[in-house]
Amino acid sequence: MAGRPGSSNAEAAGAVGPTDEARGQAESSQKIEDLMEMVKKLQKVGSLEPRVEVLINRINEVQQAKKKASEELGDARTVWETLQKELDSLSGEKVRLKEILSKKQETLRVLRLHCQDKENEAQRKQTMLQECKERISALNSQIEQEKNKQRQLRLDFEEQLEDLMGQYKDLWEFHKPERLALEISTLDSGKEQLLKEEKLVEAKLEDVKHRLCSQFGAKGHTINEGLFLRSPEAAAVVHLFEEENRKAQELLEAAAQRQEQLQQKCQQLQQKRQRLKEELEKLGVQVLAQAQSKQEEEAGLGEAANPKPLGVSEEKDQEPSTK
């Protein structure tokens, strides 16, 4: 940029040099022509002698002017050559500066493109970062929901397990096999006792009949037996015997019915116990499978957000299920 005024000055100097030279030559030739015309005029007039001294002075002046013009012309040529050299050097400097400017402009363009690429990359990374933050927030909320759901499932499972364990405990306490076996043995012994009493009553009845037969004889057996059977004592004995027999039959039937009910109840309790055990095993397996699957899902989701708290929650979730 600093070379431009110099180049303009050099061009101006180059233009001024030839102009001064032409001007000096024109002046000297003009003076010579003036002198020649003056000489011709004097020759015509005939008064040349008085003007010789004037002519000599004028010639001297012309020579001095010519010499001065020649010197000025030499100086102008020297200046012109110097300015021409300076102009050439400034032209080369101008070309070099143009090349440097072109390179700088190309570098600036590349840097601008690079800066634009960096800005686009930064914008893209900022967008990706924002998306990752939103995704992490969504995953954290989803993990929290899964934790709450898992906690609720665990609480429900614990309540169901406690309820089933309470029912199983009540059934086990009130209907133990030892207790049922004891009741069955008690009923069996009562049944045997009733059978013994029935046999004893039958033996007593046979004994009474035998005594009656021995007292009244074989002949009047039917008459005496009929009279005896019609008597109030016989009716009372028969009524008593029938009452005892009926009671014994009722007790025997009640004992048999009770034994059958106890056996059926024992079978039902065993079936119910087996069913409760199967339900407990099935429910435990299902809950464990659900807990394991939920924990695996939480572990998979927590790898992107916060795996360590997720692992701690999984250990907390596994503790009640193992208990």
From Swiss-Prot:
Q: Which domain of life is it from?
A: Eukaryota
- List this protein's GO terms for biological process: cell division; synaptonemal complex assembly
Renumbered to this chain, region (Disordered) spans 1-31, 294-323
Per the record's keyword annotation, is Disulfide bond included, yes or no?
no
Compositional bias, Polar residues, is annotated for 1-10
Give UniProt keywords alphabetically.
Answer: Cell cycle, Cell division, Chromosome, Coiled coil, Meiosis, Nucleus
Bias kind Basic and acidic residues: ranges: 20-31, 313-323
Provide a GO CC annotation, any one.
chromosome
Subcellular compartments: Nucleus; Chromosome
- Coiled-coil positions are 25-290
> Pfam families from the xrefs?
SYCE1
Main subcellular location: nucleus
Provide the family line.
Belongs to the SYCE family.
As for what it does, the entry says:
Major component of the transverse central element of synaptonemal complexes (SCS), formed between homologous chromosomes during meiotic prophase. Requires SYCP1 in order to be incorporated into the central element. May have a role in the synaptonemal complex assembly, stabilization and recombination.
Subunit (UniProt): Homodimer. Found in a complex with SYCP1 and SYCE2. Interacts with SYCP1, SYCE2 and SYCE3. Interacts with SIX6OS1.
Q: What is this protein called?
A: Synaptonemal complex central element protein 1
